[in-house]
Amino acid sequence: MFSGSGAIGLEAASRGAKEVHLIDKSAQTFPILKQNIDNLGFADFCFCYNSDSYSVIKSEKIKSKSFDIIFIDPPYCKEMIPEVIKIVSENNMLSDDGIIVTKIDSIEEVYEGYQNIELIKKKKYGN
């Protein structure tokens, strides 16, 4: 979620992910994301959505899926991660052995989890 040009998701695709869903609402970066998918020949299993991440993960098409890895990379200092994790948890979108990887600014509070999703490890890089 909050995919930008798709670098993280496309790296997962290049390493064997069977299906990748990339969400970004930016009118500036979405065409780049789409072009990157096409350039890499991943259009058959990489699906991109030019919309608000919350709306997409609440949609019937997505919320019925179970994911092994979910990357959440929202704009810094927006406190968006708790709501995303709540939606993922309430819709059982994370597989039993799945993981969520998030990235936040160092001034943001680390989110400890929600219901069946809990923080296992945190690392600090940079500021």
What is each PLM-predicted segment?
Residues 1-127:
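Class I S-adenosyl-L-methionine-dependent methyltransferase catalytic core
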